[in-house]
């Protein structure tokens, strides 16, 4: 669809609870995915929701601690984003545009380039931590949040 925003639904009932549209930007044409807001992710602490905007070359940041989430800021990226993921420690966001964003300051701190300074872009970004030459932790390309609800012991 052409929604520049997202919807929140109740998985049990199938009912839509909230429809959140990006404010201050117009929907526009996109080159891929057919939808201006294809990529969406939660920060690992789940306090924020980050939404890709392929029509305006932006990532919009929403406060996810309130319902419906409230738009707080927008970050300009160098090309049309189609995905976003986060570092395991939650300090950096990786846009499919190759921009690495400091989550706290909202500033681009690095851009991925090849040896000839060409832009490197991918929706498939995986963070792997090594210790003594062996992988000990791995992220994934999905910004699903990392908060785990405590369950009662039986």
What are these regions (language model features)?
Residues 1-154:
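Predominantly soluble domains enriched in secretory-pathway, periplasmic, or organellar proteins
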